[in-house]
C-alpha cells in the first residue's frame, strides 16, 4: 500500500481536491429508502459509532454492531454501550457476512487491521463505509473491486450528531464515493441514504471526495480547530499570570472564553464576533490579528504542504509503529501545563460580555486562525465550502470541549490523528506567539477592558469593510442560511 493521493497525476489531484457541490434538499426526497430493509453493521462503538447508529435506527434502519471477540468477552466499554442501547452485538464472523453495508467507525490507526480482518468476510457486492477517508487516501488501502466504498462525514463530534438529531435537525455533512470502488454505480445513493439517516440532510450536505475531505479535515483540525486553541490557551494563561491576575480568574477566562467568543462566530461569522467588541477594542483586535497572521502564515502553509505531500501522515504513522511515543509524551506534557492545572474558579462570576471585553487577544487569535486556515486551504485548491466547514464552522464545537474540561477534554474527544497534528502545530505556534506577539501587547488586550480612544471614522469603516468582505464571511453567510435551526452551544447555560 502507498499514499493514494500521490499515485494520482496532477490533473486527477486537482480534480479530487476541487470536488465540492452543495446538494439541494430535493435530492434527499427519498430519505433513507435506499437502505430500508438492508442489514447495516457498524464496526466500533465510540462517539461516532454509537451516535450515528442511534440516529440510523431511529430513522428506521436495521443496525447491529460487530466488535472484536475480546471486546465482547471482556465486556469492554464499546460492548456495554451497544448492548445497553439495545443493539444486536456480535463478532465479526457472525455479523459481517450478513451485512449489505459495513461501516468502519473505529479509530484511524485501527483501520488497516480492521479492513484486513473483515474484507474476507464481506459478501460479494456489499458496501464499505467510512466517516473519515484517511485509510483510503493516506494509507492507500485497496478494497476488493466488487465492494462499493462510500463516506459520510458529519462535521462535528459524535455527541453533537445525536443531540441535533433529537432536536429534529442535523449537522452539516460531507459525502463521497471512492472513484476506484463504485462497481454498480450505487455509491451516491448509499451515501445519501446514510446521510439522511443521521439527519445531515437537514443541515446541508456537500458532495465531496475522499481526497478533499481528508486534506481539508487534517488542515482544519491541526491549525485553527485544535492547534490554535491549544497554543492560545497556554500562552494567554501564562500572560495573565505574569500580569498578576488571579489564577482562578485567568483559568476561567480562558476555559470558557473560547466557547463564548466562538458562539458569536457560529451565529454570525467573524463579523458578529468582532461586533461584540467596542469600537476601540475592535480596531485593536483587527490590528493584533494582522500581526498574528504575519507571524504564523508560514506555519499554516507548512502544515498544508505536509498534508498535501503525505509527509504528515508518514510521520504520524511512524509514531503509530513506535507505540505512539511522541503522542503520549506530548499528551503528558500538556497535562502538566499551568493552564491545565489552574484552579477551577467556580465561585468567580464572569459575564458574557466580559469574555469579549477582557479577551481581545483571544478574539484576534480566532480571527487570524480562521482566516489563515481558510485562505491556505483555498489557495491549495480546496473549495470554499469545504474550507468553511473545516475551519469556522467546527470551531465552536471544539471550543465547547475546552469549556467542559480544558485541553484534556478536547484531546480526548478529537481523534488521535487530530490530537497528533494539534501537538505538532501548537508546539511550534505557542513559542512564536509568546516571543513575537505577547511582548507587543498593550493595556486592555487581555484580562481587562480596552481603554476608550478617539475613533477615526474612515479607519473604522475600512476595518469593517475588510472584515465583512473576507471570502469566508461571504460563503459563511450563504451556508449558515441552511443552519437557521442551530441551537446555542453552551456549557454554562
UniProtKB/Swiss-Prot annotation:
Name the UniProt record assigns to this protein: Ketol-acid reductoisomerase (NADP(+))
GO MF entry, a single one: ketol-acid reductoisomerase activity
Gene3D superfamilies: N-(1-d-carboxylethyl)-l-norvaline Dehydrogenase, domain 2, NAD(P)-binding Rossmann-like Domain
A GO CC term attached to the entry: cytosol
Domain KARI C-terminal knotted per the UniProt entry, residue ranges: 209-345, 346-486
Binding, Mg(2+) 1: 217, 221
UniProt function note: Involved in the biosynthesis of branched-chain amino acids (BCAA). Catalyzes an alkyl-migration followed by a ketol-acid reduction of (S)-2-acetolactate (S2AL) to yield (R)-2,3-dihydroxy-isovalerate. In the isomerase reaction, S2AL is rearranged via a Mg-dependent methyl migration to produce 3-hydroxy-3-methyl-2-ketobutyrate (HMKB). In the reductase reaction, this 2-ketoacid undergoes a metal-dependent reduction by NADPH to yield (R)-2,3-dihydroxy-isovalerate.
Binding of Mg(2+) 2, residues: 217, 390, 394
A Pfam family the protein falls into: KARI_C
Highest taxon of source: Bacteria
Similarity comment text for this entry: Belongs to the ketol-acid reductoisomerase family.
Residues reported in the UniProt entry to bind NADP(+): 45-48, 68, 76, 78, 108-110, 158
Annotated catalytic residues: 132
PANTHER family reported for this sequence: KETOL-ACID REDUCTOISOMERASE, MITOCHONDRIAL (PTHR21371:SF1)
EC class (word): oxidoreductase
Cofactor(s) for this UniProt protein: Mg(2+)
NCBIfam families, sorted: ilvC, PRK05225.1
Lineage: Bacteria, Pseudomonadati, Pseudomonadota, Gammaproteobacteria, Pasteurellales
UniProt pathway: Amino-acid biosynthesis; L-isoleucine biosynthesis; L-isoleucine from 2-oxobutanoate: step 2/4; Amino-acid biosynthesis; L-valine biosynthesis; L-valine from pyruvate: step 2/4
Keyword set, alphabetical order: Amino-acid biosynthesis, Branched-chain amino acid biosynthesis, Magnesium, Metal-binding, NADP, Oxidoreductase, Repeat
InterPro entries per UniProt: 6-PGluconate_DH-like_C_sf (IPR008927), 6PGD_dom2 (IPR013328), KARI (IPR013023), KARI_C (IPR000506), KARI_N (IPR013116), NAD(P)-bd_dom_sf (IPR036291)
Chain ranges of the KARI N-terminal Rossmann domain: 14-208
UniProt EC number: 1.1.1.86
Cofactor note: Binds 2 magnesium ions per subunit.
Catalytic reactions of this protein: (2R)-2,3-dihydroxy-3-methylbutanoate + NADP(+) = (2S)-2-acetolactate + NADPH + H(+); (2R,3R)-2,3-dihydroxy-3-methylpentanoate + NADP(+) = (S)-2-ethyl-2-hydroxy-3-oxobutanoate + NADPH + H(+)
One GO BP annotation of this record: L-valine biosynthetic process
Keyword Membrane: no
Amino acid at each position: 500500500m502507498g499514499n493514494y493521493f500521490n499515485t494520482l497525476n496532477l490533473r486527477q489531484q486537482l480534480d479530487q481536491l476541487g470536488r465540492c457541490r452543495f446538494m439541494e434538499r430535493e435530492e434527499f426526497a427519498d430519505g433513507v429508502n435506499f437502505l430500508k430493509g438492508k442489514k447495516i453493521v457498524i464496526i466500533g462503538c465510540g462517539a461516532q459509532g454509537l451516535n450515528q447508529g442511534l440516529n440510523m435506527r431511529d430513522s428506521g434502519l436495521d443496525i447491529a454492531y460487530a466488535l472484536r471477540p475480546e471486546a465482547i468477552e471482556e465486556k469492554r466499554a464499546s460492548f456495554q454501550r451497544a448492548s445497553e442501547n439495545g443493539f444486536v452485538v456480535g463478532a465479526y464472523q457472525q455479523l459481517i457476512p450478513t451485512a449489505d453495508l459495513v461501516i468502519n467507525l473505529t479509530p484511524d490507526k485501527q483501520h488497516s487491521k480492521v479492513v484486513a480482518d473483515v474484507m474476507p468476510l464481506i459478501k460479494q457486492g456489499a458496501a464499505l463505509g467510512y466517516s473519515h477517508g484517511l485509510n483510503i487516501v493516506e494509507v492507500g488501502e485497496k478494497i476488493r473491486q466488487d465492494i462499493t466504498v462510500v463516506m459520510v462525514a458529519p462535521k462535528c463530534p459524535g455527541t453533537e450528531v445525536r443531540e441535533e438529531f433529537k432536536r429534529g435537525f442535523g449537522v452539516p455533512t460531507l459525502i463521497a464515493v471512492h472513484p476506484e470502488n463504485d462497481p454498480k454505480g450505487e455509491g451516491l445513493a448509499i451515501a445519501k441514504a446514510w446521510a439522511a439517516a443521521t439527519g445531515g440532510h437537514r443541515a446541508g450536505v456537500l458532495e465531496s471526495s475522499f481526497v478533499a475531505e481528508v486534506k481539508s479535515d487534517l488542515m482544519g483540525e491541526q491549525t485553527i480547530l485544535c492547534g490554535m486553541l491549544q497554543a492560545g490557551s497556554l500562552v494567554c494563561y501564562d500572560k495573565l499570570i505574569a500580569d498578576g491576575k488571579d489564577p482562578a480568574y485567568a483559568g476561567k477566562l480562558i476555559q470558557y472564553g473560547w466557547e463564548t467568543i466562538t458562539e458569536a462566530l457560529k451565529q454570525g461569522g467573524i463579523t458578529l464576533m468582532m461586533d461584540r467588541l467596542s469600537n476601540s477594542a475592535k480596531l485593536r483586535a483587527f490590528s493584533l490579528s494582522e500581526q498574528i497572521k504575519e507571524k504564523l502564515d508560514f506555519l499554516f502553509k507548512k502544515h498544508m504542504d505536509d498534508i498535501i505531500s503525505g509527509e504528515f501522515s508518514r510521520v504520524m504513522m511512524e509514531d503509530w509503529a513506535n507505540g505512539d511515543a511522541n503522542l503520549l509524551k506530548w499528551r503528558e506534557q500538556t497535562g502538566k501545563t499551568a493552564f491545565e492545572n489552574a484552579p477551577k474558579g467556580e465561585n468567580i462570576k464572569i459575564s458574557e460580555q466580559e469574555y469579549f471585553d477582557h479577551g481581545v487577544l483571544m478574539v484576534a487569535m480566532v480571527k487570524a486562525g480562521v482566516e489563515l486556515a481558510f485562505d491556505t486551504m483555498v489557495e491549495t485548491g480546496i473549495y470554499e465550502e469545504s474550507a468553511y466547514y473545516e475551519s469556522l464552522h467546527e470551531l465552536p464545537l471544539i471550543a465547547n470541549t475546552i469549556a467542559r474540561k480544558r485541553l484534556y477534554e478536547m484531546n480526548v474527544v478529537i481523534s488521535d490523528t487530530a490530537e497528533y497534528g494539534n501537538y505538532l502545530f501548537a508546539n511550534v505556534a505557542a513559542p512564536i506567539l509568546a516571543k513575537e506577539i505577547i511582548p507587543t501587547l498593550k493595556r486592555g488586550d487581555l484580562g481587562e477592558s480596552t481603554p476608550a480612544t478617539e475613533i477615526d471614522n474612515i479607519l473604522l469603516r475600512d476595518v469593517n469593510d475588510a472584515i465583512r468582505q473576507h471570502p469566508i464571511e461571504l460563503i459563511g453567510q450563504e451556508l449558515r442560511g441552511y443552519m437557521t435551526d442551530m441551537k446555542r452551544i453552551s456549557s454554562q447555560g
